[in-house]
């Protein structure tokens, strides 16, 4: 008897495959989360707080800006040095972003989906609401696809609409591995020293022409690059 176009007995359907992949992905995220916690405990930290906000009461909220290739242990850095601060992270709406969003939520942060390079009106509105509620926002302004160290316009739009200052931040490592990704993503080696650099907050000015907007974009990009030692 012909089975026609129906599924053969014992075969896995596409829907079942997606469920299996989803369970595997969640298991990998949970395992990676625990591994990252153990890994981070071997690291030594040094703080360079030029903004004077570490350990201080929360009096102002910020748009935290960090280059994408420094992202790996950043949630742990926030937990360690800013336990009193809460907020949301902008994560790519891609499938790869699904796993990162799950991991970020495990660190206790809310997630807004969207691209920092092409931030849509919905994402800007959601992030503005987070800032208006007194919480912080974290963005990697060259993510999710680069070019590396090139600041996308989304963070400028957000800072102008919300009025919140941008806080450039950076992580430098004494010893690390570099991946072959578009931004040469950085993995600190176990027992490395991590320097946490925090710049003075920067307010983005309102702009009326493309030239003025580009000047603000370059000024913020330069402020972030001033913290970078290892490219």
Model-derived features: positions:
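A cross-family acyltransferase "interaction/gating" segment
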Residues: 150-209
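Membrane-anchoring hydrophobic helices of lipid-metabolizing enzymes
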Residues: 2-77, 84, 191-193, 219-231
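Catalytic core of membrane glycerolipid acyltransferases/transacylases, capturing the structured
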Residues: 60-118
């Amino acid at each position: 008897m012909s089975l026609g176009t129906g599924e053969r007995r014992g075969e896995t359907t596409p829907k079942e495959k997606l469920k299996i992949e989803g369970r595997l992905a969640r298991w990998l995220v949970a395992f990676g989360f625990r591994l990252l916690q153990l890994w981070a405990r071997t690291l030594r930290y040094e703080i360079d707080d030029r903004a004077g906000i570490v350990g201080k009461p929360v009096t102002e909220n910020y748009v935290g800006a960090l280059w994408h290739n420094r992202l790996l242990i950043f949630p742990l850095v926030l937990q360690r040095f800013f336990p009193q601060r809460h907020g949301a992270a902008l994560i790519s709406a891609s499938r790869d972003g699904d796993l990162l969003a799950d991991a970020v939520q495990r660190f206790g942060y809310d997630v807004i989906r969207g691209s920092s390079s092409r931030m849509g009106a919905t994402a800007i509105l959601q992030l503005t609401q987070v800032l208006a509620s007194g919480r912080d926002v974290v963005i990697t302004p060259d993510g999710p696809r680069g070019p590396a160290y090139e600041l996308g316009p989304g963070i400028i739009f957000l800072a102008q609409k919300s009025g919140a200052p941008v806080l450039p931040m950076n992580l430098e490592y004494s010893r690390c591995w570099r991946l072959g990704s578009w931004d040469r993503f950085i993995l600190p080696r176990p027992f490395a020293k991590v320097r946490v650099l925090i710049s003075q907050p920067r307010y983005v000015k309102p702009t009326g022409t493309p030239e003025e907007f580009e000047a603000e974009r370059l000024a913020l990009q330069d402020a972030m690059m001033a913290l970078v030692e290892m490219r």
